[in-house]
From Swiss-Prot:
EC number(s) per entry: 1.3.1.9
Alphabetized GO MF terms: enoyl-[acyl-carrier-protein] reductase (NADH) activity; NAD binding; trans-2-enoyl-CoA reductase (NADH) activity
Pathways involved: Lipid metabolism; fatty acid biosynthesis
Gene for this chain: fabV
Top-level division of the source organism's lineage: Bacteria
Protein name: Enoyl-[acyl-carrier-protein] reductase [NADH]
Residues given in the record as NAD(+) binding sites: 48-53, 74-75, 111-112, 139-140, 244, 273-275
Source organism of the structure: Shewanella baltica (strain OS155 / ATCC BAA-1091)
Site, as annotated: Plays an important role in discriminating NADH against NADPH: E75
InterPro entries referenced in this protein's UniProt entry, alphabetically: Eno_Rdtase_FAD-bd_dom (IPR024906), Enoyl-CoA_Rdtase_cat_dom (IPR024910), FabV-like_NADH_b (IPR050048), Trans-2-enoyl-CoA_reductase (IPR010758)
Family note: Belongs to the TER reductase family.
Function: Involved in the final reduction of the elongation cycle of fatty acid synthesis (FAS II). Catalyzes the reduction of a carbon-carbon double bond in an enoyl moiety that is covalently linked to an acyl carrier protein (ACP).
Pfam families from the UniProt entry: Eno-Rase_FAD_bd, Eno-Rase_NADH_b, Enoyl_reductase
Length: 400
């Protein structure tokens, strides 16, 4: 079939398998160009490995460090008449390229919050790898099914305490609007922590540890975002921030446990990037369009892949073997360039000036839109979007 982009809200409902493969190839090429990571991991589990930072982590491990990888994700395959999710095609492409280089690659399509997912991964590790030396936790899910009761819990992207009103961009109509978000209830805050906090990360490490499949020096990392006062009301000071603070709590507990055998647990605070997850957060698209333009001008721009390669090579797996620099809460900070005072001051000054008319001139909004559509495999140079493609793509994946 011929597949064209169809956008609804902040999601593109169609995906292009050839475009998604090209995205993965581009990240692999970038990783290889940067060279091998001297003390990199060799057997890596990525929970949430099909897009964004999780996918880049799997690529950094495999193509930057020749690691065997197991990827866990929840995606929909395509059929003969309907495209699957971008994450499905990304994972299929990763598997194809990894196997072509003789790298071990196993993928599990399942609910990562479930007991079954953890048991299946343990089984695979015991059978094929013996143990693993790194666990990346990179889940971005709006819903969590509690593994014991089966109850569905939903997260809320809402402020706490008072209604939040701010200048934002309507990405469908490409115009500046005033976005208003009502505050979260106590229940919504608690539910957001349940879905997006550190509990499931702890359950993963507990299951892996009890099964005896964590190597002595195993490192685990979970991803977070803090941002600045421009986005704090909706993010760090909102319901989502409470969940991210719970990740810090979990990291502390896990670090105590793992450091006893030479391992470590850290939260890595990353920069804002264009992902399906960030596009759903009110105000983030406009902030990203502003900050990206300034960071590009300063030569500091990084996408997911550049960020993660820097985290692997300059923080977690340094050539000199030293421990990564951390902040006072033991977090690895890769938002350092974004938070530079001159960059943030630029955004603060710009925010009140942006109108629908000058949006594309003052910010990188056009580039934001292009990067967003690229997540789904569209708008990539060298791909013939009028060509007939088969949306049904099979690969070596275990379905639970």
């Amino acid at each position: 079939m011929i597949i064209k982009p169809k956008i609804r809200g902040f999601i593109c409902t169609t995906t292009h398998p050839v475009g998604c493969e090209a995205n993965v190839q581009e990240q692999i090429t970038l990783t290889k160009a940067k060279g091998k990571i001297a003390n990199g991991p060799k057997k890596v589990l990525v929970v949430g490995s099909s897009s964004g930072y999780g996918l880049s982590s799997r690529i950094a491990a495999a193509f930057g460090s020749d690691a065997a990888t197991i990827g866990v994700f929840f995606e929909k395959p395509g059929t003969e008449t309907k495209p699957g999710t971008a994450g499905w095609y990304n994972s299929a492409a990763f598997d194809k390229f990894a196997k072509a280089e003789g790298l071990y690659s196993k993928s599990i399509n399942c609910d990562a919050f479930s007991h079954e997912a953890k048991q299946k991964v343990i089984e695979l590790i015991k059978q094929d790898l013996g143990e693993i030396d790194m666990v990346v936790y990179s889940l971005a899910s709006p819903v969590r099914k509690l593994p014991d009761s089966g109850e569905l819990i939903r997260s809320a992207l809402k402020p706490i305490g008072e209604t939040y009103t701010a200048t934002a961009v309507d990405t469908n109509k490409d115009c500046i609007i005033e976005a208003t978000v009502e505050p979260a209830t106590e229940q919504e805050i608690a539910d957001t922590v349940t879905v997006m906090g550190g509990e499931d990360w702890e359950l993963w490490i507990k299951a892996l540890s009890e099964a005896g499949v964590l190597a002595d020096n195993c490192k685990t990392v979970a991803y977070s975002y803090i941002g600045t006062e421009l986005t704090w009301p909706i993010y760090w000071h909102g319901a989502l921030g409470k969940a991210k603070m719970d990740l810090d709590r979990a990291a502390k507990a896990l670090n105590e446990q793992l450091s006893a055998t030479g391992g470590s647990a850290n939260v890595a605070v990353l920069k804002s990037v264009v992902t399906q997850a960030s596009s759903a957060i009110p105000v983030m698209p406009l902030y990203i369009a502003m900050v990206f333009k300034k960071m590009r001008q300063e030569g500091l721009h990084e996408g997911c892949m550049e960020q993660i390669y820097r985290m692997f090579s300059e923080r977690l797996f340094r050539a000199d073997g030293a421990k990564p620099e951390t902040d006072s809460d033991n977090r690895i900070r890769l938002d350092d360039w974004e938070l530079r005072e001159d960059i943030q001051q630029h955004c603060r000054n710009l925010w009140p000036q942006v109108t629908t008319e000058n949006l594309s001139e003052l910010t990188d909004y056009r580039e934001y839109k292009a990067e967003f559509i690229k997540l789904f495999g569209f708008g990539i140079e060298g791909i013939d979007y009028d060509a007939d493609v088969n949306p049904y793509v099979e690969f070596d994946v275990i379905e639970l």
